């Protein structure tokens, strides 16, 4: 369904059917073949652009050394950290290049400086893509049942539902509600036995970078660390949580259980969103529907692919141009849990008087 949301009150139905009227192969056939071909030169160009901008703003902030400029610097630098994360995200999907070695190198260079364990995150993100829209097996921003919601400890509810924009660092250590494991430990249930060495590689790389930050703090003090790293990092965390939350949290998105779920149906349970002038800065990550259907497609080919599949998707395509913060707070209040049973169910919250299925 194409959502053209102009106000928080807009409610549009979702055409729920047992089977979608198109197949994954039909969608793939509609997309130009070159959309699946990454360009190493172009991909590296985005990586070096982000790194160059980050280095440039570090130099500018150090040169000015002004508390009037620092808040601006934090917003810009944190946003650029987020952009660099998206480059590493492409590496994790294998859409940066066809070389696994290059993908892993650039992935580590992109993610380690922003405290993301590349392989640990890559693997859990793979699980998310393989199970999107499945209440029981999705990895990120999935709903809990009303029963589990009522059983959650107060601090779990606080973090998941009232402080969601700072949840990511804790997720790396503890995953999401009702899931066990850590992104840093090779023995975590997240990982297969053959993935342990890769997970350890990323964990050691991140530990080395934390040691480097400790050395800088020892040399220049805590205020230096706060000004030049912690504050931009927190902005990055907000961006990551905000964007991923909005891609998968909306009171008109159905969630599935059991045999009623399958990959394509789940992949369509996400939304394209418009971030305005930020779109090119964070590499069009808001073009999310096509990405979930074909995650091996480079980010710079997603807009073209989206236009190619929209005629086939028809009302199954979701797009929102609702202002980002308005969309966030609408879902923030409306989306807390789903019914204990059933499939094709929708988010509800304690404040809306109980479960009422959308028309």
Swiss-Prot record:
A motif (Histidine box-1) lies at residues 89-93. It is found in: Membrane. InterPro entries: FA_desaturase_dom, Fatty_acid_desaturase. Induction: The level of transcripts is negligible in the dark-grown cells and is enhanced about 10-fold by exposure of the cells to light. Low basic levels of the gene transcripts increase rapidly upon exposure to low temperature and decrease again to low levels in cells shifted back to high temperature. Expression in cells grown at 22 degrees Celsius is 10 times higher than expression in cells grown at 34 degrees Celsius. The induction of expression is completely blocked in the presence of rifampicin, chloramphenicol and 3-(3,4-dichlorophenyl)-1,1-dimethylurea (DCMU). Keywords: Fatty acid biosynthesis, Fatty acid metabolism, Iron, Lipid biosynthesis, Lipid metabolism, Membrane, Oxidoreductase, Transmembrane, Transmembrane helix. It is a multi-pass membrane protein. It catalyses: a 1-[(9Z,12Z)-octadecdienoyl]-2-acyl-glycerolipid + 2 reduced [2Fe-2S]-[ferredoxin] + O2 + 2 H(+) = a 1-[(9Z,12Z,15Z)-octadectrienoyl]-2-acyl-glycerolipid + 2 oxidized [2Fe-2S]-[ferredoxin] + 2 H2O; a 1-[(6Z,9Z,12Z)-octadectrienoyl]-2-acyl-glycerolipid + 2 reduced [2Fe-2S]-[ferredoxin] + O2 + 2 H(+) = a 1-[(6Z,9Z,12Z,15Z)-octadectetraenoyl]-2-acyl-glycerolipid + 2 oxidized [2Fe-2S]-[ferredoxin] + 2 H2O. Its main location: membrane. The keyword Oxidoreductase applies. A motif (Histidine box-3) lies at residues 291-295. One of its GO terms (cellular component) is membrane. Its EC number is 1.14.19.36. Its cofactor is Fe(2+). GO terms for biological process: unsaturated fatty acid biosynthetic process. It is an enzyme of class 1 (oxidoreductase). Pathway: Lipid metabolism; polyunsaturated fatty acid biosynthesis. The keyword Ribosomal protein does not apply. One of its GO terms (molecular function) is oxidoreductase activity. A motif (Histidine box-2) lies at residues 125-129. The histidine box domains are involved in binding the catalytic metal ions. Desaturase involved in fatty acid biosynthesis. Introduces a double bond at carbon 15 of linoleoyl and gamma-linolenoyl groups attached to the sn-1 position of the glycerol moiety of membrane glycerolipids. Belongs to the fatty acid desaturase type 2 family. This is sn-1 acyl-lipid omega-3 desaturase (ferredoxin). It comes from Synechocystis sp. (strain ATCC 27184 / PCC 6803 / Kazusa). The gene is desB.
């Amino acid at each position: 369904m194409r959502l053209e949301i102009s106000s928080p009150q807009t409610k549009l139905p979702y055409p729920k059917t047992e089977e979608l009227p198109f197949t994954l192969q039909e969608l793939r056939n509609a997309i130009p073949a070159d959309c699946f071909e990454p360009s190493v030169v172009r991909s590296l160009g985005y990586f070096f652009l982000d790194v160059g901008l980050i280095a440039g703003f570090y130099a500018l902030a150090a040169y000015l050394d002004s508390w009037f400029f620092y808040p601006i610097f934090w917003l810009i630098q944190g946003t650029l950290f987020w952009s660099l994360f998206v480059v590493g995200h492409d590496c994790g999907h294998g859409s940066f290049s066809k070389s696994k070695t290059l993908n892993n190198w650039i992935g580590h260079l992109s993610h380690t400086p922003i405290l993301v364990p590349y392989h640990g995150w890559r693997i859990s993100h793979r699980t998310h893509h393989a199970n999107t829209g499945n209440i029981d097996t999705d990895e990120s921003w999935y709903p809990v049942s009303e029963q589990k919601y009522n059983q959650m400890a107060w601090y779990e509810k606080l973090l998941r539902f009232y402080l969601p924009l700072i949840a990511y660092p804790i997720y790396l250590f503890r995953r999401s509600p009702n899931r066990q494991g850590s992104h840093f430990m090779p023995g975590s249930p997240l990982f297969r036995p053959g993935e342990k060495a890769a997970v350890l590689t990323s964990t050691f790389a991140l530990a080395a970078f934390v040691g480097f930050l400790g050395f800088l703090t020892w040399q220049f003090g805590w205020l230096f660390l706060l000004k030049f790293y912690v504050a931009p990092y927190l902005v990055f965390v907000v961006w990551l949580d905000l964007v991923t939350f909005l891609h998968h949290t909306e009171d008109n998105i159905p969630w599935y259980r059991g045999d009623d779920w399958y990959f394509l149906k789940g992949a369509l349970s996400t939304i394209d969103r418009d971030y305005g002038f930020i779109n090119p800065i964070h590499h069009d990550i808001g073009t999310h529907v096509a990405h979930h259907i074909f995650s091996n497609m480079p980010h710079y080919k997603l807009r073209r692919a989206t236009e190619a599949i929209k005629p086939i998707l028809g009302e199954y395509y979701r797009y929102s141009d609702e202002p980002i913060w308005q969309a966030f707070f609408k879902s923030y209040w409306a989306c807390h849990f789903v019914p204990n049973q059933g499939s094709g169910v929708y988010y509800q919250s304690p404040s809306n008087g109980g479960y009422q299925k959308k028309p």
